[in-house]
């Protein structure tokens, strides 16, 4: 049976884990690392690079390298590469395919089923886009679960005792979530993890802290050299990498040096060099507004759950950005001096929790029940542009709610159902999820027809809406796919393209290996000829040398079949060298053997002669004819 995995599809880094013997294990990637950079690049040759290898070449390939694509999930953003428009789902699918390949290599078996995480505050369109990305990558997405919930799942099973209230503070590379969960364990060790409230900001994360450093560096260069680096893509990429490194160093040091040579040139040809020192105090001062934005979601969660800070038993920090001292201090301040739990790895805990949930769904773990919530209220637009909520935020999912509405005009033949997600009073201020029309309503005065609108949120947090005219029985339904809505045929096309790209990449790898082997064989054969020229006939030397040159010539081109043919011909010719050398070796061995036998015979005669004085009696040979003559 194919293995199920848990995947944390992150803004900056991604991680994959699985259950081994019922216990979660983080899977090491092909490069030997436990996390994979969420970076995708398209090389000039058309090869798709993912992870560390894509990140390393970003400076020299800025326009064809995509990072932090998670921030575009659920939007109509695209990137044009060689005339093809790539959606966020397709870029994310490349990251998932890399994780899938590495997991299959690690486990030695196919990986098809996955639980993929997303920020708790992701709206419906973003969740649907995440699920579509998994589908394009060739995965059967068992469930989409919230990142803080996954973290609590991983933490709670290991550390949780009876009825503990856990606050998960999740600040990643691009998103921020706060979730409050209650973990209960019965006498049999069965855990129930229930989300009580969640809140967040989908556009707040480590990338924003990096950007503050970049802006500061750009400003310093402008003041010193009069050069605006904000328009220079290559310089900006170098600054981005330096800013990220500086941010990390300031988590353990009170200051860091940022030094870069030849960033750009001034109009008069003077090279732009950068050599700045950034202190932690200055960094915290320039990012204080970002830190302030973390307060509101925290306070909202406590308000929605109806609890005070003293009711929180444990605080769990998730996401690499929580390593920043200012963030840790803020959490301590917000929670009334509580020390955050340091027992979980903030980069891996989400994937570990997702792996546990995959085991629960597949039946490998029967000791836990997870109850999640919808992060945003759902409703429809009614007369006057009002947002009429059918499902309030923080409602446990899956859930289903219905409400009866009517027409606004006499003899109205149809109604337009406009679905929104959000907390504002007017529909226009919320996120539009989709629109559909219920037609064929029987003529009647306004307010008479009864139209039942039903919202159904599944365990992935994805919304299904239906409307039914109770008078005529006519019904219309839709699955909300949001602004990024990809129809099924579009997803199927993307799946096929992704498979084709994977096949192309595999072929490209095989071709590269063929060329490497051919090149090595050409040079080893050439060396063999040069080392044994005195033992080989001129004909053989010429034939093999010609074949070596033919193979080298084939290697200059792009035709792999030509390389294979040339290598086969060289192999055939090179066999003659082996035959000659082995034949000569055999002849030399035979000659040496004959010489040794002769020497042994001579030794035997000498031995006989030397022994004649002893007890040896020599026979006398008598010639009969000679004897007769003598008589």
From Swiss-Prot:
Name of protein: Chaperone protein DnaK
Residue numbers spanned by region Disordered: 586-631
Phosphothreonine modification, residue list: 175
The keyword Hydrolase belongs to this UniProt entry's keyword annotation: no
Database matches in Pfam families: HSP70
SUPFAM superfamilies: Actin-like ATPase domain, Heat shock protein 70kD (HSP70), C-terminal subdomain, Heat shock protein 70kD (HSP70), peptide-binding domain
Lineage: Bacteria, Bacillati, Actinomycetota, Actinomycetes, Bifidobacteriales
Species whose genome carries this gene: Bifidobacterium longum subsp. infantis (strain ATCC 15697 / DSM 20088 / JCM 1222 / NCTC 11817 / S12)
Similarity-based family: Belongs to the heat shock protein 70 family.
Superkingdom per UniProt: Bacteria
Keyword terms, alphabetized: ATP-binding, Chaperone, Nucleotide-binding, Phosphoprotein, Stress response
HAMAP family: DnaK
Start-end of Acidic residues biased regions: 612-631
């Amino acid at each position: 049976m194919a293995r199920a995995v848990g995947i944390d599809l992150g803004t900056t880094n991604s991680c994959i884990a699985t259950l081994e013997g019922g216990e979660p294990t983080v899977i090491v990637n092909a490069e030997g690392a436990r996390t994979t950079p969420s970076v995708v690049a398209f090389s000039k040759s058309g090869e798709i690079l993912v992870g560390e290898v894509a990140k390393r070449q970003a400076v020299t390939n800025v326009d064809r390298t995509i990072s932090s694509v998670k921030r575009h999930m659920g939007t109509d953003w695209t990137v044009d590469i060689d005339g093809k428009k790539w959606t966020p789902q397709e870029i994310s699918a490349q990251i998932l395919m890399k994780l899938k390949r590495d997991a299959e290599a690690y486990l030695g078996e196919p990986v098809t089923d996955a639980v993929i995480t997303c920020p708790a505050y992701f709206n419906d369109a973003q969740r649907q886009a995440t699920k579509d990305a998994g589908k394009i990558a060739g995965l059967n997405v068992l469930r989409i679960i919230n990142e803080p919930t996954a973290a609590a799942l991983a933490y709670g099973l290991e550390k949780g005792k009876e009825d503990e209230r856990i606050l998960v503070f999740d600040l990643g590379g691009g998103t921020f979530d706060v979730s409050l969960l209650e973990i209960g364990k019965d006498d049999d060790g069965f855990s129930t993890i229930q989300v009580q409230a969640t809140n967040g900001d989908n556009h707040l994360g480590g990338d924003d802290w990096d950007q503050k450093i970049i802006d500061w560096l750009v400003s310093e260069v402008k003041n010193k050299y009069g050069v605006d680096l904000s328009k220079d893509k290559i310089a900006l990429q170098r600054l981005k990498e330096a800013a990220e490194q500086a941010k990390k160093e300031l988590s353990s040091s009170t200051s860091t040096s940022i030094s870069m040579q030849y960033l750009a040139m001034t109009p008069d040809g003077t090279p732009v060099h950068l050599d700045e020192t950034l202190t932690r105090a200055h960094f915290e001062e320039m990012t204080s507004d970002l830190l302030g934005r973390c307060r509101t979601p925290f306070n909202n969660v406590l308000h929605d759950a109806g609890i005070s800070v003293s009711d929180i038993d444990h605080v769990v920090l998730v996401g690499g950005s929580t390593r920043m001292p200012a963030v840790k201090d803020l959490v301590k301040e917000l929670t009334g001096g509580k020390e955050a739990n340091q027992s979980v790895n903030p980069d891996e805990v989400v994937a570990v929790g997702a792996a546990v949930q995959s085991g629960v769904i597949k039946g490998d773990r029967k000791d836990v029940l997870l109850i999640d919530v919808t992060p945003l209220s759902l409703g429809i637009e009614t007369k006057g542009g009002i947002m009429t909520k059918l499902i309030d935020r923080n409602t446990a999912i899956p859930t289903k709610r219905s409400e009866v509405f009517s027409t606004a005009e006499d003899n109205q033949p149809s109604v337009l159902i406009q679905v929104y997600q959000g907390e504002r009073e007017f529909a226009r201020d919320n996120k539009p999820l989709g629109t559909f029309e219920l037609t064929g309503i029987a003529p009647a005065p306004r307010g008479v027809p009864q139209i039942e609108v039903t919202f159904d949120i599944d365990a992935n947090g994805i919304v299904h809406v239906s409307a039914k005219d109770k008078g005529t029985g006519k019904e219309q339904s839709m699955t909300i796919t949001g602004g990024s809505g990809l129809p099924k045929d579009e997803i199927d096309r993307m799946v096929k393209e992704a498979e084709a790209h994977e096949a192309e990449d595999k072929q490209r790898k095989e071709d590269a290996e063929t060329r490497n082997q051919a090149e090595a064989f050409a040079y080893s054969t050439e060396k063999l000829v040069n080392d044994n020229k005195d033992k080989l006939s001129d004909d053989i030397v010429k034939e093999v040398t010609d074949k070596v040159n033919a193979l080298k010539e084939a290697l200059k081109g792009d035709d792999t079949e030509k390389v294979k043919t040339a290598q086969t011909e060289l192999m055939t010719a090179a066999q003659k060298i082996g035959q000659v050398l082995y034949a000569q070796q055999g002849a030399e061995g035979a000659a040496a053997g004959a010489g040794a036998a002769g020497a042994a015979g001579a030794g035997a005669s000498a031995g006989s002669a030397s022994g004649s004085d002893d007890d040896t009696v020599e026979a006398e040979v008598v010639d009969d004819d000679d004897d007769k003559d003598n008589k």
